[in-house]
């Protein structure tokens, strides 16, 4: 296995807009190592983005639970190591449908509503796209992406994220082929909403 900063790489978990995440192992324990994308034309920008992840981790951790622990933060080499959360993403569950046994259940929705409420209480919202959330085998919910913003209702779970969680066919297309053409209204970062309003009402009644 390839070694990266003293960790053995098991597999690549994914590549995002700010970096690449790897499942790694050290001393018989597994972690997630995220190596930041290097902004070669603007090294200062790389550092700002990297430090932003730590800042978001600190803000998000104020809700008390549901955030992977940060174990290592290397400013020189621009990588961080955090707790590895095993389970299924909300995106995978969403492809099986809402309010069904093998998809997103009532309990799953209660948990994300509770978490989004806790984020709101500390004055932030996160990226509620369902790939950023994992339900563990023991039933716990984690937000695995260190990304947050000052609270804005336009981008919270109720007014933005929920529509991605309810768009079964769109999420399946996204996971299989990439792209957001079946998730977002053309030319926007806003999700299709009208087809899912009745389901949304059912979810929000759980609050």
Predicted features and spans:
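Conserved hydrophobic "DFG−1" position in protein kinase catalytic cores
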Residues: 23, 35, 72, 81-84, ...
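Hydrophobic residue at the +6 position relative to the catalytic HRD Asp in the kinase catalytic loop
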Residues: 128-134
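C-lobe/activation-segment region of protein kinase-like
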Residues: 124, 136-207
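ATP-binding glycine-rich loop module of kinase domains
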Residues: 11-12, 17-51
